[in-house]
């Protein structure tokens, strides 16, 4: 066959078929389809009509196979028109049958056309198409390629390669010593067979080179395989579509540049390209699927793009691929690409977060790392100068704003990815000198010899509340304590007795500032505490960076106070001397039963205690005002009520003078501290008329 691995020239003739009388009616029919919108002019060209006429095909399926996919539905109508335009011809007499002669074997690599004494006459029968020595393609069912052609564009040509041919199982027993690859191409539309297409190469190697310049937006490549026991046998067999590829023409004049943090791209897209896909790929991810990095999807980008969203300090690979719709599938060209490294900008940290530990002894810091440079954290007692934030200055000038080298935090930082997918830098367990009640943390972005201060935040460490005391003043309580260091105020929560503040506090609360505490000498609680007692939980409150910080809790128990009030009515004889006294008692709240009481008489003064005088005989009265029991030295009500109009007690005052007073008769000091017995007006307790 000669040098089959080399390219061979296109042997297809360019016969003029304008003289075919069927062309004009077919052109008029095509124009009707175009005008009605049934087909697009680009999809159904005059070349397709000429191709059908030149082939001589009149069968519907054969015509359908020669038309583009979007026009194939009109094949039956075209076959009908051809049948109407073809005149019927009388059948000629059969020619004499010549003596059979052995067919000479054609020379390897040569094409031989049959010799005739007269030029061929166009008829309605099939017209052979020059096929570079191969049997004409016979239309059958649609063929589907088994493989893809690998296409690589170089400066001078397009390199094509494909997998070597392997015979299917049904041909394994046949002799296929010769495998011939027919590499063909067609612009815009895929060829229906190898015959009308441009022959790129005829080779026995699974590769070829196309040195032609591509001028159309799309070029279709096909590899057809002819196999046989010999070259002659292979040429006589029907070709099989083996591999295909679609090559989209790339952009030209590709240029990329950075402009003040934006990236600008310029190019020229070939005519016929509908859009250019632009990709911005991080340089360390160039081997990953680029689809996720496509940008500017809303525009066609035919002349270029402007990317306003790259991250400063990062390096990207920008790619541009021409996009063309081929039979409903978007095909992309090879990429024109260039790397761009954006100059990093010195950016301050503005989202520093300070999380103080529960004990107030340490805190955790976190922030979003800027695109360029590194971040140093400075810890100070007073913070930097107020006008230094977000201002670029030399690193040597940090001391002038109050950030000296010894204030820099030297702990190792870690990076983590948050729930939103963004990176966060973190410093954990950061402490500060114990004598500081407040610490300021300032993030500083460093790049080269430049520095920029970010937003400063503070953390507060309040002292523990100690020496808590609750003084009872019968009608109010006064809470006192040592004021905690660093606290702006103290908050007090009320909770049930024995409540653990770690379980949460959501009851009533009271808050007092340092100024109020010093003015009133403590926190005064008038009628605020429950009679039955409660627990009080105190915590220091400070403010850091506009945030309210609550310190550790300290607690005290309030046992409560039962307030009782009694009234005395003294009965006298005609001479004004006391004879009896009636005693009534009411409580702040209803209580079943009561403690014991003693009515004490002191002839000299108002009794000061249960032992400061002599107990008076007393007895309960019934509903009629008569003694209901024998006299005794102790009063005990069956119930203490808020009305006090229930039981009455009577006292025998005959022969007594001076003063009387009622006392609670309980031996336990702890129990006495939860009962307050309020005296009536002192004049009602005096027995004699003598003045004090």
Curated annotation (Swiss-Prot):
- Residue stretches of biased makeup (Pro residues): 89-107
GO cellular component terms, semicolon-separated: cytoplasm
Note the superkingdom of the native organism.
Bacteria
Q: Which subcellular locations apply to this protein? A: Cytoplasm
Task: Tell me the segments the record calls region Disordered.
Answer: 1-23, 87-134
Query: In which residue ranges is the amino acid composition biased (Basic and acidic residues)?
Result: 1-21
Query: Looking at the keywords, is Mitochondrion present?
Result: no
Disulfide topology: none
* Effect of inactivating the gene: Loss of DNA conjugation when disrupted in recipient strain (MKD8), no effect when disrupted in donor strain (mc(2)155). The recipient strain does not secrete EsxB. Disruption of the probable saeA-saeB-saeC operon completely blocks polar localization of EccCb1.
Alphabetic keyword roster: Cytoplasm
What other facts are recorded?
DNA conjugation in M.smegmatis is unidirectional with distinct donor and recipient strains; mc(2)155 is a donor strain while MKD8 is a recipient strain. Mutations in a donor strain that alter DNA transfer do not always alter DNA transfer in a recipient strain.
Q: What does this protein do?
A: May be involved in assembly of the ESX-1 / type VII specialized secretion system (T7SS), which exports several proteins including EsxA and EsxB. Involved in DNA conjugation in recipient (MKD8) but not donor (mc(2)155) strain.
Protein known as: Putative ESX-1 scaffolding and assembly protein SaeA
From the broadest rank down, the organism's phylogenetic lineage runs: Bacteria, Bacillati, Actinomycetota, Actinomycetes, Mycobacteriales
| Encoding gene (name) | saeA
């Amino acid at each position: 066959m000669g040098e089959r691995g080399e390219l061979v020239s296109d042997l297809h003739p360019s016969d003029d078929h304008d003289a075919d009388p069927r062309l004009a009616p077919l052109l008029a029919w095509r124009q009707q389809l175009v005008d009605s919108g049934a087909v697009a002019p680009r999809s159904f060209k005059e070349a397709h009509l000429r191709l059908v006429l030149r082939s001589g095909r009149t069968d519907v399926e054969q015509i359908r196979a020669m038309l583009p996919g979007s026009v194939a539905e009109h094949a039956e109508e075209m076959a009908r028109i051809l049948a109407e335009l073809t005149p019927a011809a009388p059948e000629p007499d059969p020619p004499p049958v010549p003596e059979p002669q052995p067919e000479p074997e054609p020379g390897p690599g040569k094409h031989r056309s049959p010799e005739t004494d007269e030029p061929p006459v166009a008829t309605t029968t099939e017209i052979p198409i020059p096929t570079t020595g191969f049997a004409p393609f016979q239309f059958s069912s649609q063929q589907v390629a088994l493989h893809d052609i690998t296409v690589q564009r170089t400066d001078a040509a397009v390199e094509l390669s494909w997998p070597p041919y392997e015979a299917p199982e049904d041909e394994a027993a046949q002799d296929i010593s010769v495998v011939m690859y027919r590499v063909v191409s067609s612009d815009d539309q895929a060829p229906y067979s190898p015959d009308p297409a441009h022959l790129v190469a005829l080779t026995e190697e699974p590769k070829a080179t196309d040195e032609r310049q591509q001028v159309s937006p799309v070029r279709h490549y096909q590899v057809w395989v002819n196999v046989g026991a010999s070259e002659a046998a292979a040429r006589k067999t029907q070709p099989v579509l083996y591999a295909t590829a679609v090559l989209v023409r790339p952009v030209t004049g590709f240029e990329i540049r950075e402009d003040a943090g934006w990236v600008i791209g310029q190019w020229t897209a070939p005519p016929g390209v509908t859009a250019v896909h632009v990709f911005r790929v991080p340089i360390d991810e160039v081997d990953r699927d680029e689809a996720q990095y496509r940008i500017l999807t809303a525009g066609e980008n035919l002349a270029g793009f402007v990317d306003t969203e790259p991250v400063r300090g990062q390096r990207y690979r920008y790619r541009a691929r021409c996009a063309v719709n081929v039979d409903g599938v978007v095909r992309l060209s090879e990429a024109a690409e260039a790397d761009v490294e954006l100059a990093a900008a010195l950016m301050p940290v503005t989202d520093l977060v300070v999380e103080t530990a529960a004990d107030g002894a340490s805190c955790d810091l976190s922030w979003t790392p800027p695109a360029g440079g590194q971040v140093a954290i400075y810890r100070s007692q007073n913070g930097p100068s107020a006008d230094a934030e977000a201002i670029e200055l030399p690193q040597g000038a940090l001391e002038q704003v109050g950030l000296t080298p010894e204030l820099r935090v030297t702990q190792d930082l870690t990076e983590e990815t948050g729930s939103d997918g963004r990176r966060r830098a973190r410093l954990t367990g950061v402490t500060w000198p114990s004598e500081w009640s407040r610490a300021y943390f300032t993030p500083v972005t460093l790049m080269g010899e430049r520095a920029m201060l970010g937003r400063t935040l503070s953390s507060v460490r309040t002292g523990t509340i100690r020496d808590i005391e609750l003084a009872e003043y019968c009608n109010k309580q006064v809470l006192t304590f040592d004021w905690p260091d660093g606290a702006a105020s103290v908050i007090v929560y009320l909770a049930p007795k024995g409540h653990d503040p770690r379980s949460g506090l959501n009851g009533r609360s009271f808050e007092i500032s340092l100024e109020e505490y010093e003015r009133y000498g403590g926190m005064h609680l008038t009628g605020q505490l429950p009679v039955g007692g409660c627990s009080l939980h105190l915590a220091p409150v400070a403010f850091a960076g506009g945030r309210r910080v609550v310190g550790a809790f300290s607690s005290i128990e309030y046992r409560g106070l039962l307030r009782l009030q009694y009234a005395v009515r003294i009965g006298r004889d005609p001479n004004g001397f006391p004879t009896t006294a009636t005693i009534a008692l009411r409580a702040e709240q209803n209580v079943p039963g009561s403690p014991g009481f003693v009515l004490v008489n002191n002839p000299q003064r108002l009794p000061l205690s249960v032992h400061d005088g002599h107990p008076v005989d007393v007895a309960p009265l019934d509903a009629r005002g008569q003694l209901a029991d024998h006299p005794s030295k102790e009063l005990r009500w069956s119930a203490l009520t808020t009305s006090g109009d229930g039981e009455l007690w009577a006292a025998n005052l005959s022969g007594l003078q001076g003063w009387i007073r009622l006392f609670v008769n309980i031996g336990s000091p702890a129990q006495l501290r939860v009962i307050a017995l309020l005296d009536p007006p002192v004049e009602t307790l005096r027995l004699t008329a003598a003045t004090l």
